[in-house]
């Protein structure tokens, strides 16, 4: 039997296992039985996988059998040739067949003219030489199946005669089972593939996670009995004073000529946090409270880098991460004496937002209960990577504004006409803390039926919200605030700031727009993708349907 030289031997490497190829390429020089015949020793790249395959080949040489790829093709050709000779008398020849047979003969001659190395089986070779072949009778176990790509890949038979009959009859019954015809695959760019994936996802309804479903169909009273007391207690605990003192003690030596003050903010301070929530801290170094930076300046980043060194050298603090490239860079650290993780920044906007949320939660407790529930729902749905707690809180506020239960934020803010406005950059950050009776609003009693009813309507509302044309706008607090018109509806201070800083306008060309009610150029959901929004909408729809079902638990009819 003839085989090719070593450099062109494995013409169809995908047909064989990698271990088998490595074995024969390694041992070929000592397997040839003809004197003077040589074959190059092909050295594979020395990798962990290569060494593993070589070891396997040496341990199981009898299980790795050789067969030239042409052997199988020649076997099938001879089968067909013998069948035609037996069934056709006299044999027939057409111009196309004559051309193909001539090309086959020329190909065989070219192959033999290359002086292929002749290899003997082990039983005919000298001891230690020869190759273990696949036995000829094994070829009989391999059968072919022919399918037609023009007929939805329909199987037309296991013999060439049936395949020829199918073609000669011009594809009879091209789609006998009414299967959808698959178009021929075409080359797609990465962008086209991504667009196709996004389009396909839009037609798929994502099922609500089991943990979220269990919370929704379970006793709603348990959610608040477990979460609310903890959240309310975490607003003020002695550990915060210890953290503030230790932080000032740690950082003051690094900035001896600048006043330093620490402000606490975030979900722990507003009353919707839990024991695993981070404590957000704004460190004012050098009276920078009223300084606004759309993105952190080099000076701000330099301060944070200097602060990082103090955390690295401290025995009371453990540095977790330094997120320098974020819009608001933060240092994530853990205060070891209390075990509380802290997010430290040099931006005062978070503290200003927290003051607003505290006022709303205290004036309308229903808001706090709803935010605790949807925060827990968001975590169980694993949506927190794209939709933050602050974002979903603003959505709750906007929804209650539409129910005339909360005032628009614009109504609360004090304009600088009376010289009372507190500004951080161009943004008004203070507001009139009027009672709801002064605002003409009703304060609802937060009972379980009331909370559940508003939660059901909340999820139903945002399941049907037109995110393409409208935005969630707590600043204006009205329904159907159009994305195309929002910038013309804001006060002159916004227009002046954006005119001087065109790159700092609010990002409206996003799948989802939720506007910060204080920093008006900030879309807090700009990170939400189309698929993320579709998932959120699907979850809202399913949650609203589950909350629509009447509760069988008598405890849910009573207040806390």
Swiss-Prot record:
GO terms for molecular function: ATP binding; metal ion binding; RNA uridylyltransferase activity. This is Terminal uridylyltransferase Tailor. Its main location: cytoplasm. Disruption phenotype: Viable. Fertility is significantly reduced. InterPro entries: MTPAP-like_central, NT_sf. It catalyses: RNA(n) + UTP = RNA(n)-3'-uridine ribonucleotide + diphosphate. Residues 169-197 are annotated as: Disordered. Residues 455-522 form the PAP-associated domain. Its EC number is 2.7.7.52. The keyword Coiled coil does not apply. The gene is Tailor. Residues 176-188 have a biased composition (Low complexity). GO terms for biological process: negative regulation of pre-miRNA processing; positive regulation of miRNA catabolic process; regulatory ncRNA-mediated gene silencing. It is found in: Cytoplasm. GO terms for cellular component: cytoplasm. Signal peptide: none annotated. Pfam families: MTPAP-like_central. Coiled coil: none annotated. It is an enzyme of class 2 (transferase). Mg(2+) binds at residues 278, 280. Uridylyltransferase which mediates terminal uridylation of miRNAs, leading to their degradation. Has high specificity for splicing-derived miRNAs (mirtrons) and other miRNA substrates containing a 3'-G terminal nucleotide. Appears to be a major suppressor of mirtron biogenesis. It comes from Drosophila melanogaster. CDD domains: NT_PAP_TUTase.
